[in-house]
Amino acid sequence: MIIGIMKTFLLTICFLSVQTGMVAIAQDKEQTPVYLDDTQPIEVRVQDALNRMTVEEKTRLSYAQGKFSSPGCPRLGIPELWMSDGPHGVRAEINWNDWGYAGWTNDSCTAFPALTCLAASWNPLLAAKYGYAIGEEARYREKDVLLGPGVNIYRTPLNGRNFEYMGEDPYLASELCVPYIQGVQKNGVAACVKHYALNNQELWRGHIDVQLSDRALYEIYLPAFKAAVERGKAWSIMGAYNKVRGTHATHHKLLNNDILKGEWNFDGCVITDWGAAHDTYEAAMYGLDIEMGSYTNGLTSESEFGYDDYYLGKSYLKMVREGKIPMEVVNDKAARVLRLIFRTAMNRRKPFGALTSEEHYRTAYEIATEGIVLLKNGTGKKQPALLPVPQGKYKRILVVGDNATRNLMLGGGSSELKVQKVISSLDGIKAKFGDGVVYAQGYTSGRPMYGRADVIPQVTVDSLRNDAVEKAMNSDLVIFVGGLNKNHFQDCEGGDRLSYELPFAQNELIEALLKVNKNLVAVIVSGNAVEMPWVKEIPSIVQSWYLGSVGGEALADVLSGEVTPSGKLPFSYPVKLEDCPAHFFGEISYPGDSIRQEYKEDILVGYRWYDTKKVQPLFPFGYGMSYTTFEYSKPVISAQTMNTDGSIDVSVKVKNTGKVAGKEIIQLYIGDEECSVLRPVKELKDFRKVQLLPNEEKEVKFTIKPEALQFFDDKQRTWVAEPGKFKAYIAASSSDIRGTVTFEYIQ
């Protein structure tokens, strides 16, 4: 009896406790502001927060509070945003008010290969892995916005920042940036796609005024940004330094209001490049949402707490109070910043991230090995192929070159990285080929300084060259590892290359080495094409890139044949600089007259120019050799006509006819045979990367839709596909056509 009473009593207590808890939870739910309730849709939360904020709080969201931070709304418990460079790795911590490094001991990162290497891989699956891995590192470091990827088009090989971008073709850049962005943002970190738009040179980047046609703008320079927004769903965009048609790009009505936020329905934030804003009214009215700055007032001085002096600081608030800036503009800006904060800093469902994990190093290795491009490998009996280099074949291997030992993560401007580990080219080659490897520096390039370059004494140049030549005489194989580096006036932010040739007397060194040893493999480390006056004399040439933390291991595995090279060039290699379309028209086209420049080549950028003008490049776009060979069947088309709502399939069989496994990149180009306006001979519209074992054959099918036939009609301001005949090219590169089919488009 007593036991029964006790049970009843305990059950009653439990029931009352549960009821009380449920009531408390319900009350808490009712008391939680909507903007803090992450079960609510983001747009509902944004509107609720806006309704609670003062004008001062709304405008304060739009400018920096530190070098890499912008504020939230402390009164409402809305946190600040933290940003970080860059597209290849998460940059070490920077001081609050200056550009000095903070000296932390826990901010080392994985250096991933530069984006030119990713572009050379032609592998969207790797782009997704890249984005997710770098996003994990940013998340672990508690960053909300990762300042990348860069998708500016490769217009000239002199651009100091080409290594950060994805080549000359808008379709290739689009297909790779989308999975990269999606990968980053799965971590609750915003990708900030840059530099919007037309920041295609570093020289005079802060003020050069770009003049171009609407066709060039829409067909060449905007597609990757459009893909980033519409397909990648990028949460932020970085405005560029340069002017476009007289107005700074970072607050530009056509670019930001009409195209980005109008035509593409972008709902994220436009963030300045650091110090890129120049006018309060334009910044407010023409689409800028967050202003960041190189200096604490955004322009000139190093005052300690001058953030209110930014163009979107107190001047912006004053204009709002005076009625010069409508409140709908203020609310739109604030809503965009809040939306970004809710997606990142206030996203409680984001993962914890990871830093310098083995998985990240493996991803970096895969990108590096798939991006390395074999440019040349013998020409026959008189010049036999030197690659791959079997282990044990050569007793003495000489590695020559400053880049073989240089830490190529240093320098370059905002892409500079502090890495946990780095495997240099020499380290990788020694680990692969053993004690028979010796080293000679051969040349020196000086310190990786920003804004200036070391002057190398001639006595040093001669001494290093003589030492390398002497060692080459007594070596069985010479591997030259040279090219460019991250020094100023090379592959570096803030300045362009001064010439197309290799710097630091490398051409003279290569010629001297060839005179004493013909068994020479040249490995060119760069993010740009370089002049090669010795190209016919060297048996084997490899285009390496800035390969990141484990680049030396990746390079050694490709040289040895453990990995078969499968990269293909994401840009054309001109024989001489004047062959490049940006340079064909003289200084007004590049670099401009210091105030203004005209893109006179119009839509004929890269291979579009070489094809149309019948100029032979040194190495064409989409080109890359392998240690195996591939045979293409005759392509088959599914129909001879296509209507406005139809499509056509083009199929081709590809067979590995060599003795080792390899990967081939099959490229589809489309040419308009009958058009009322100038169009290139052909344009890349699709590609596939397939892996094939020896004697294995696979069928690749491409589906062509009317969108692939279109050009931008600048009179109607719309995309148009004119009826008529079209040709589909199946190719191994833009110059290596393996088959064609024709069809007619009918409206």
From Swiss-Prot:
Its EC number is 3.2.1.21. Pathway: Glucan metabolism; xyloglucan degradation. The keyword DNA damage does not apply. It holds the Pfam family Glyco_hydro_3_C. The keyword Cell cycle does not apply. GO terms for cellular component: periplasmic space. It is found in: Periplasm. It catalyses: Hydrolysis of terminal, non-reducing beta-D-glucosyl residues with release of beta-D-glucose. Residues 1-26 form the signal peptide. GO terms for molecular function: beta-glucosidase activity. The active site is at D273. InterPro entries: Cellulose_deg_GH3, Fn3-like, Glyco_hydro_3_AS, Glyco_hydro_3_C, Glyco_hydro_3_C_sf, Glyco_hydro_3_N, Glyco_hydro_3_N_sf, Glycoside_hydrolase_SF. GO terms for biological process: symbiotic process benefiting host; xyloglucan catabolic process. Keywords: Carbohydrate metabolism, Glycosidase, Hydrolase, Periplasm, Polysaccharide degradation, Signal. It is an enzyme of class 3 (hydrolase). Optimum pH is 6.0-7.0. Belongs to the glycosyl hydrolase 3 family. Gut bacteria supply the human body with energy from dietary polysaccharides through glycosidases that are absent in the human genome. Xyloglucans are a ubiquitous family of highly branched plant cell wall polysaccharides present in the vegetables we consume. Enzymes involved in xyloglucan degradation mediate the conversion of otherwise indigestible plant polysaccharides to short-chain fatty acids. Catalyzes the hydrolysis of terminal, non-reducing beta-D-glucosyl residues with release of beta-D-glucose in xyloglucan degradation, leading to remove the backbone 'G' units. This is Beta-glucosidase BoGH3A. The lineage of its organism: Bacteria, Pseudomonadati, Bacteroidota, Bacteroidia, Bacteroidales.
